[in-house]
């Protein structure tokens, strides 16, 4: 062990005994740490205090950005001095005790940041739809564009990670397709015919011969049909079995019949019977 290292160890032990812990680092030879400096103290006044220990090479008071003193500084000597002796001594300035100790240079952690390998991205995956379509197109998923990363150098080394490859797995999915289908009809034209309402009036009546003969039964049919198109008239017979009063007013011979009451039934033998089990008396005018 050299004399300088032994002296540095003694200085560290002395500083520990003065109730403050020294920071880790390299001890600067022939340099003393001075703490407890008042803001009114200047470098010339502090240099005059240490002239008795040796020729002062440099004296520096640490200040902040605004130039205000932080309250401590360093005094270095040209010649080799006994720093331990200076630290053990009591130096007062204007009744204020200064804090002395060996000057220690902190270790600067110089670390290098290593850029990790770039991410490898596989080429774009092409998707094909699972449905069948005449205008089916393939869809291509574009790869993301990654901007170049600037390399930085930091103070601490970090282990570099291995290159990472991201593989895109094609996924086949069925998506609902929407398309328009035009209705296909046969070439023949279809005509739809709706049945038109039709009415048939049937009535039976007995007419008395004006010459005094026997009653002559007659049956008349009146067909009425309405065509939907109006061009071709089609007959539809619907047996309503209904006798109307209008059908008995006129006959094919355009003879007008007068209706009689029940009292006239005794006077006249001409009787007109309807199918609805009602008796109506009819008088024929001569």
Curated annotation (Swiss-Prot):
Belongs to the RRM DAZ family. PROSITE patterns: DAZ, RRM. Its main location: cytoplasm. It comes from the Eukaryota. Residues 155-180 form the DAZ domain. GO terms for cellular component: cytoplasm; mitochondrial cloud; pole plasm. Coiled coil: none annotated. InterPro entries: DAZ_dom, DAZ_RRM_vert, Nucleotide-bd_a/b_plait_sf, RBD_domain_sf, RRM_dom. Disulfide bonds: none annotated. Interacts with the C-terminus of pabp1 and with epabp. Prior to oocyte maturation, found in a complex with epabp and pum2 proteins and spdy1 mRNA; pum2 dissociates from the complex during maturation. It comes from Xenopus tropicalis (Western clawed frog). Residues 30-105 form the RRM domain. The gene is dazl. It is found in: Cytoplasm. RNA-binding protein that is required for primordial germ cell (PGC) differentiation and indirectly necessary for the migration of PGCs through the endoderm. May promote meiotic cell division during spermatogenesis. Shows a preference for G- and U-rich RNAs and probably binds the 3'-UTR of target mRNAs. Stimulates the initiation of translation of mRNAs through the recruitment of poly(A)-binding proteins (PABPs). This is Deleted in azoospermia-like. One of its GO terms (biological process) is positive regulation of translational initiation. Keywords: Cytoplasm, Developmental protein, Differentiation, Oogenesis, RNA-binding, Spermatogenesis, Translation regulation. SUPFAM superfamilies: RNA-binding domain, RBD. Germ-line specific; expressed in adult testis and ovary. Localized specifically to the oocyte and embryonic germ plasm and to migrating primordial germ cells (PGCs). One of its GO terms (molecular function) is mRNA 3'-UTR binding.
